Amino acid sequence: MRSYEFAEDYRKNDAICRADVGIGPYKRPPISTAHTQMIRKYPMRNIALTLKYLGTAYHGWQVQKTVTTVGQTLEEAAAAVVGHPVHMTGCGRTDAGVHARVYVANFRTSARIPCDRIPYALNTHLPEDIVVTNAMEVHEDFNAIGSCVKKEYTYLIYNSGIRDPFYVNRAWFYPKHLDETVMQRAADCFIGTHDFAAVRSVGTDVKSTVRTVYDYKVERDGDLISLRVSANGFLYNTVSYTHLTLPTTERV
């Protein structure tokens, strides 16, 4: 996941993420009496975080019951900083092993810590493969997933007869030569508004399987081919399935 763009008018997006609370591999502690008193004394603030992470060691973003995730790790760090349990809303559900260059999440807190100090405070409690780069106070209606209007993913293919150890966990090793011009013609077919029900994991609960793809670029730099796609949203595993389809187009 490479970047996200957000609507300027946050008040247009008042839907709050209803992700389950307390289902992670840890049990979120109950809100203490001291925190309840703090809430009464100070208004709740909505804090948006920008972060980047290497996803190799994590089972995606979403908090899960028995495995370690990026969302869970960030929640634990934030709770240690602000002194009370928090719930993070992420701008998208990255899959296991997926990295993020620019990822946005938000949470609510009554703590008075200045925003310019939050990244430093959080990073002292985070592992080195997750880094918070910015924090800012946003409108109370801002929601990282509801306010997100564009998402961009980049998928890398290492196209060479010999592996490169520096691209392990970073690129798909594909030894047979690929023609990026043929792959680009196939990628162009995905641009526009389409029903992507056929290229997603079954069993996912969504209101609509229609998404709009804004751009899909296939570019080669030596042995490295990058597939970069941007859209208003993606279904579960749609990006992986479409990327894996492109190399096979030469054989059709």
Q: How would you describe each model-predicted region?
A:
Residues 130, 135-230, 240:
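Non-catalytic RNA-recognition surface used by pseudouridine synthases
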Residues 242-248:
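Conserved small/polar residues in nucleotide/adenosyl-binding loops
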Residues 51, 107-111, 157, 176, ...:
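Short beta-strand-to-loop capping motifs
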Residues 2, 19, 23-24, 28-29, ...:
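Short, low-complexity intrinsically disordered segments enriched in A/P/G/S/L with frequent Arg
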Residues 47-52, 153-154:
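Active-site-flanking beta-strand signature of metal-NTP-handling nucleotidyl enzymes
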Residues 86-110, 141-142:
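Short, charge-patterned binding micro-sites
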Residues 66-78:
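Short catalytic helix/loop segments, enriched in acidic residues and glycine
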